[in-house]
Design a protein with these regions (language model features):
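Metal-dependent enolase-superfamily TIM-barrel catalytic cores that perform enediolate-based chemistry
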Residues: 1-83
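Hydrophobic faces of well-ordered beta-strands that scaffold small-molecule active sites
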Residues: 4-8, 34-40, 64-65, 87-90, ...
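Short, surface-exposed acidic/glycine-rich loop or hinge patches that mediate macromolecular interfaces
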Residues: 11-13, 43, 69, 92-94, ...
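Generic secondary-structure signature for well-ordered alpha-helical cores
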Residues: 27-30, 58, 84, 136-139, ...
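Catalytic cores of alpha/beta
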Residues: 46-56, 74, 96-109, 125-131, ...
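A general structural motif
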Residues: 67-72, 89-101, 119-126
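Active-site-adjacent C-terminal substructures of enzyme catalytic domains
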Residues: 105-145
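Flexible C-terminal active-site loop/helix
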Residues: 146-196
Length: 196
């Protein structure tokens, strides 16, 4: 289908099985062919996270989202400073809506990336605040959807297009719904195109 970036959820089954699956994918596709991202949704414990991150880093992954559950700033800051695999904050950003809270969180944890979900992070204006603060600290970012209908997905896609961010964005949830409005966007190879 032309996709160059795949995100896989991990942490739900046995770690060795998940690692074997990732090794299988990587044995068939180099990181130049397929960018692999993983999302642990906070499934790792602070005590075993570093060992798992080291093992995952051997697979030339792009990054891992939220390795430990949100709210453990000290532990997450340690991981972001010591991990051989870049860490992206996701759930960690939820609930921090003032500029000062955003500055404090990013300055304390210093992740390599943050993931902006406008529906969960204060809308488009809140997302722009996260992006501005991240860029001040040289923190990378990308935008994803969070189970919006095609109306929300269309708005997020058009907003996303206003930025000059070469990273693959996560805008693919519209196909999950069986009763959805028509979408003026279409996926061609690895890009989203406005069709109407």
């Amino acid at each position: 289908a032309g996709f160059r970036c795949i995100k896989l959820k991990i942490g739900a089954i046995n770690f060795e099985e998940e690692l074997a699956l990732l090794q299988h994918i990587r044995s068939h596709y180099s990181s130049k062919e397929i960018e692999l991202r993983v999302d642990a949704n906070g499934a790792f414990s602070p005590t075993d996270a570093m060992e798992k991150l080291k093992r995952l880093s051997e697979l030339d992954l792009h990054s891992i989202e939220q390795p430990i559950r949100a709210g453990q700033w000290e532990e997450m800051a340690r991981l972001t400073s010591e991990s051989p695999l870049p860490i992206a904050l996701d759930e960690e950003l939820i609930g921090y809506n003032t500029w000062e809270e955003k500055q404090r969180l990013l300055s304390a944890i210093r992740p390599q990336y943050i993931i902006i979900k406008p529906s969960l992070h204060g809308g488009l204006a809140g997302g722009e605040e996260w992006i501005a603060e991240a860029e001040k600290l040289n923190i990378g970012w990308w935008i994803t959807s969070a189970l919006e209908s095609n109306i929300g997905l269309n708005a997020i896609a058009q907003w996303c297009a206003t930025f000059d961010n070469p990273l693959p964005q996560g805008l693919g949830t519209g196909l999950l719904f069986t009763d959805n409005v028509e979408m003026p966007l279409e996926i061609r190879k690895d890009c989203l195109w406005f069709c109407k």
